[in-house]
């Protein structure tokens, strides 16, 4: 996985395009800094001038001329326009830098997704192959029985239909594997490795259990938020630079020239000049005021984009982190599901072989097992992908994999970088708290639905015989026993202990140690399941 991701971030066009944009932004800063230095120009000319002046004798005159001139100019004051432009382009460069980091992390995530999807569909193809083999085995058995005259034709047709479906499923999974391999080639730049490898177990490293802590990490580190903040600062510098249009520009100029008949003056050999030039625009139709209003609106737009980026990151990391918890719980349930269905399928096959189960029962069990294994394989891959999504959302995927892709000469750019007062204003750090459903409570509700059936009078064959009715004492004991179990599954320690007498003492421990052990067991994570079957009660006396 790490090798595939490293290859992707080194060669993917999305990353290299951002890198070239960063380099261009760095050169643009140097372009603006050139305004701090003087401009030096060299000019040379050769030609012939003709003129006619009636007060001169002769009135018409022609001169051959040539000359060489050197001039230099230096901006002395421009209302801080150059300084603000350099500042704006510096922030624009940082924007490109953070966009480069974001593209690197996003490409690392996409490469991880492509790698995991290839592994996913290789597993699904293998499961589809096994499913086809099982259906082919059942079909061949029925064909043999049918040809021997001991099987039914309708069973053979059913088996043939299910075999065709298994073949279709295999074809679909192979097509899916082809498609994700093509996506892998696009992102990584090479074909997937021929053999499957274990997924890097480090994907879960450093992920905090609390959703709010993970959100805090993401909002503090994600480069898309940092890029939006620098974009806002660039807009602010641009607006400050617009104020320079209300001030004059002062420029120093020096010029010297040599030549023959230089500058149209006969016999002139040399010409030198030095001057200070002030230029102050007094009116330009209100364009400067309109430009100030325009830049103010652009600042507001950049602030909106910053808050939008923050909210996007907050949503992304919250969903990815919640998917981790969801998929961890799902895998436990799906594992139990696969084991139970596998046992049922094996039992159905044995019963089918001795004629106690129909073919439809067996084929349904095979399909259910295939579906269960497919769901488990998908959940396994989705969990690894959820780890990767969470790492990428808090900008730690490449570092978790031990990889990096730095642009040369950029380390000092963000050495002391901080969001400071430019952090997002409309993006509070909030975690969504959805109350988890207690399986113990749901189980208790299910048992309450069964109470009337358990306490109802049994139906007897002879109407003349009185139906036995459970005594109130027996019904009360049964209900109290269920309440005791419900309190334990709901982790209500005080309610659970209330069912015991104050002088109750366990046979192998003290009462205090027993209570402490009960509380320790209840405090463990996970659900408690307790099933009471075949409750036997007997009333003594009236």
Regions found by a protein language model. Give the residues of each.
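Short flexible linkers and secondary-structure junctions
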Residues: 1-117, 125, 135, 153, ...
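Hydrophobic, lipid-facing positions within transmembrane beta-strands of outer-membrane proteins
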Residues: 66-72, 214, 272-278
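A short glycine-centered flexible hinge/capping loop motif at secondary-structure junctions
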Residues: 146-150, 187, 352-356, 393-397
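Short, low-complexity N-terminal intrinsically disordered segments enriched in polar/charged residues
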Residues: 459-490, 494-498
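Surface-exposed, charged secondary-structure patches
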Residues: 516-542
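Periplasmic alpha-helical coiled-coil/stalk elements that build and connect Gram-negative outer-membrane
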Residues: 103-217, 323, 327-330, 347, ...
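Acidic, low-complexity, intrinsically disordered peripheral segments
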Residues: 377-463
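Sec/SRP-type N-terminal targeting helices
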Residues: 16-20, 33-34, 76-104, 129, ...
């Amino acid at each position: 996985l790490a090798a595939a991701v490293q290859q992707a971030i080194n060669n993917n066009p999305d990353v290299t395009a951002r890198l070239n944009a960063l380099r261009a932004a760095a050169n643009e800063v140097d372009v603006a800094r050139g305004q701090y230095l003087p401009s030096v120009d060299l000019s040379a000319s050769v030609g012939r001038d003709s003129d006619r002046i009636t007060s001169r004798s002769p009135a018409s005159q022609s001169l051959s001329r040539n000359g060489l001139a050197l001039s230099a100019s230096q901006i002395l004051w421009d209302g801080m326009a150059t300084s603000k432009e350099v500042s704006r382009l510096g922030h624009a460069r940082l924007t490109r830098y953070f966009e480069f980091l974001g593209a690197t992390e996003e490409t690392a995530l996409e490469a991880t997704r492509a790698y995991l999807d290839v592994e996913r569909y290789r597993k699904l193809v293998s499961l589809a192959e096994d499913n086809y083999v099982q259906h082919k085995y059942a079909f061949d058995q029925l064909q043999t029985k049918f040809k021997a005259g001991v099987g039914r034709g309708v069973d053979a047709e059913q088996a043939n239909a299910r075999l065709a479906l298994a073949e279709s499923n295999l074809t679909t999974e192979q097509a899916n594997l082809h498609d994700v391999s093509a996506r892998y080639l696009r992102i990584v730049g090479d074909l997937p490795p021929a053999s499957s490898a274990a997924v890097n177990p480090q994907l879960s490293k450093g992920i905090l259990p609390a959703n709010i802590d993970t959100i805090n990490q993401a909002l503090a580190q994600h480069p898309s938020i940092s890029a939006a903040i620098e974009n806002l600062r660039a807009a602010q510098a641009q607006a400050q630079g617009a104020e320079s249009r209300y001030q004059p520009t002062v420029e120093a100029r020096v010029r010297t020239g040599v030549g023959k008949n230089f500058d149209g003056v006969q016999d002139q050999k040399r010409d030198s000049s030095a001057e200070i030039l002030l230029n102050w625009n007094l009116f330009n139709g209100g364009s400067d005021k309109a430009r100030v209003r325009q830049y103010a609106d652009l600042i507001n737009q950049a602030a909106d984009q910053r808050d939008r980026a923050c909210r996007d990151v907050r949503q992304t990391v919250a969903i990815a982190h919640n998917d981790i918890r969801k998929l961890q719980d799902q895998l436990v349930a799906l594992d139990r599901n696969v084991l139970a269905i596998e046992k049922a399928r094996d039992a159905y096959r044995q019963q089918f072989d001795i004629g106690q189960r129909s073919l439809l029962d067996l084929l349904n069990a095979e399909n259910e097992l295939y579906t269960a294994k497919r769901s488990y394989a998908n959940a396994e891959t989705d969990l690894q992908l959820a780890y990767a999504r969470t790492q990428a959302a808090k900008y730690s995927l490449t570092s978790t994999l031990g990889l990096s892709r730095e642009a040369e000469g950029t380390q000092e750019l963000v050495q002391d970088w901080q969001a400071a007062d430019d952090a997002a204003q409309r993006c509070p750090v909030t975690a969504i708290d959805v109350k988890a459903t207690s399986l113990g409570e749901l189980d208790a509700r299910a048992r309450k639905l069964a109470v009337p059936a358990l306490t109802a009078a049994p139906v007897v064959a002879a109407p003349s015989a009185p139906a036995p009715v459970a005594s109130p004492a027996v019904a009360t004991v049964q209900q109290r026993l269920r309440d005791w179990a419900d309190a334990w599954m709901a982790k209500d320690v005080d309610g659970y202990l209330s069912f015991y007498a104050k002088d109750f003492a366990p046979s192998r421990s003290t009462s205090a140690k027993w209570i402490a052990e009960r509380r320790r067991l209840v405090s463990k994570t996970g659900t408690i399941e307790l099933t009471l079957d075949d409750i036997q009660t007997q009333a003594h006396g009236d």
